[in-house]
Regions:
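Extreme N-terminal basic, low-complexity initiation segments
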Residues: 1-13
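Amphipathic, small/basic residue-rich leader segments at the start of a protein or domain
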Residues: 3, 16-25, 29-127
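C-terminal helix-coil-helix/basic helical segment that borders enzyme active sites and/or dimer interfaces
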Residues: 65-72, 335-365, 378-386
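Glycine-rich flavin
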Residues: 76-87, 91-197
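A short core secondary-structure module
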Residues: 192-234
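Glycine-rich phosphate/pyrophosphate-binding beta-alpha loops
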Residues: 194-199, 279-285, 402-405
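Glycine-rich beta->alpha junctions and the first turn(s) of the following alpha-helix
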Residues: 239-334
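Glycine-rich phosphate/cofactor-binding loops in nucleotide/flavin-utilizing enzymes
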Residues: 381-426
Length: 426
């Protein structure tokens, strides 16, 4: 898979469905039981990924799911989730095996974020962004970066994330305004980043910068900025409509000193990072997160349709034909999205020449699906779902973030169309 068709220079499943009557076997292990209960398929996945999927499900069941409502209600960054994932050795899923990680790719990232997202989307978002940051560091890591960052990540001792978005460039994350100056001894970084996931909680931040005002679009540098660097100033917390556990904050960098060893790749060539690493891994992480959320809404709807009965007839909602039809449409939407995401991951990991439109479209499709399915879940579950602080209400709020997070759904559909028609994306 290559994003070379972006042409920057010229541009300047099989699934185990719970259904309406599925019952979980009492013979399954805790982690496996959670997979079955949540309709999570591990068929046709590599054995190593199946193992990680089951391990993730066990962490979700024991540590993440029980506190998911609290995360939303208190707008609390899910430290317990990240700690539990670290203790289970899952923070290093993107780290090469040589440094203690699991060397997963796009498919693995989407599968693991799906497993987390069906219980706590905020936790999946925070974990996913850590994984994207890790992938960026690992892509061309020097020996110094391997030892200082990748080993610590694999050992569960280090959380990283991206700091790319800016107010001035909006959804165009690949056109930073933050600047660096090389003093000869170190870099000085000046600028303000917006919507930094894990803001104030990560141990390091992958920051994009542009060297000068006359630099071309796409001509920028990426650096690793340690969280304890003098000159890092966090602005007021941002409380979202949904994904309330995400500490998405603005970060002002005031002449922050960064050692030369923290430069990723060569200065000024980081458009490669933006479109060969950041974009595909971010899109797959978010697609998996929103697929998990859509599956959770599907599960909750099935549970309600089975349980809700009319006293005068004894009939349950699942016995009503219109409910059966509408539920089947929800199920079909989720399965189509899962199939697209799995195919995108496989093609991307194989470096398939036609992977690009699959990867570009998977987050857009997951966004459309999760908004549609959570909205339909609200309708089918009625007053029970519409009450304050209901789980489906939270799902509906969380789902809306899918269309807003950069690259937006409309932008991804535009890029997909241009890719399919042989046009440069930008």
């Amino acid at each position: 898979m290559s994003f070379a068709r972006l042409d920057i220079a010229q541009a300047k499943s099989s699934v185990i469905m719970p259904g309406l009557s599925h019952q979980t076997s009492s013979q399954t292990s805790p982690g496996t039981a959670f997979l079955y209960q949540r309709g999570l398929s591990f068929m046709e996945l590599p054995a190593s990924l199946q193992s990680l999927q089951i391990r993730t499900a066990a962490v979700v069941e024991a540590e993440i799911a029980p506190r998911a409502a609290q995360v939303d209600q208190t707008a609390q960054w899910p430290a317990h989730s990240m700690n539990a994932l670290g203790e289970a050795g899952l923070l290093g899923v993107m780290v090469p095996v040589a440094f203690g990680g699991h060397a997963q790719g796009l498919l693995g990232l989407s599968v693991i974020t799906e497993a987390i997202g069906r219980a706590c989307p905020s936790s999946a978002l925070c974990f996913g962004m850590h994984c994207v940051g890790t992938a960026v560091i690992a892509a061309k890591a020097t020996e110094f970066q391997q030892e200082r960052y990748l080993r610590a990540i694999a050992e569960g001792r280090h959380i990283t994330t991206l700091a790319l978005s800016e107010h001035g460039s909006g959804a165009h994350f690949y056109v930073p305004q933050t600047r660096i100056e090389d003093t000869g001894q170190h870099f000085l970084v000046d600028g303000t980043k917006q919507f930094v996931t894990n803001g104030g909680h990560a141990d390091s931040y992958v920051v994009s910068t542009v060297a000068s005002s006359n630099s071309d679009a796409g001509d920028f540098s990426c650096l690793i900025v340690d969280s304890d660097s003098p000159g890092l100033n966090w602005l007021d917390p941002w409380l979202g409509f949904g994904m309330r556990g995400n500490s998405s904050r603005a970060l002002h960098l005031d002449r922050v000193q960064v050692r030369h060893e923290n430069l990723l790749g060569e200065e000024g060539d980081q458009v490669w990072y933006a479109f060969e690493v950041v974009a595909p891994f971010f899109l797959m992480a978010m697609a998996g997160t929103y697929l998990g959320l859509a599956q959770a809404a599907l599960d909750a709807t099935a549970e309600h349709l089975r349980a809700r009965r009319y006293a005068h007839s004894g009939e349950s909602l699942r016995d009503i034909e219109s409910m059966q039809v509408r539920y089947s449409e929800m199920w079909m939407a989720v399965e189509k999205t899962r199939a697209l995401i799995r195919e995108a991951g496989r093609r991307g990991d194989m470096n398939h020449p036609e992977a690009l439109p699959f990867i570009l479209s998977c987050k857009a499709d997951a966004g459309d699906t999760v908004v549609r399915v959570t909205n339909e879940a609200m309708t089918l579950c009625g007053g029970a779902a519409y009450r304050e602080n209901s789980r489906i209400g939270q799902m509906l709020r969380d789902a809306r973030a899918a269309h807003i997070m950069s690259p937006t759904t409309d932008l991804l559909k535009l890029w997909t169309g241009r890719s399919l028609l042989g046009l440069p994306l930008l």
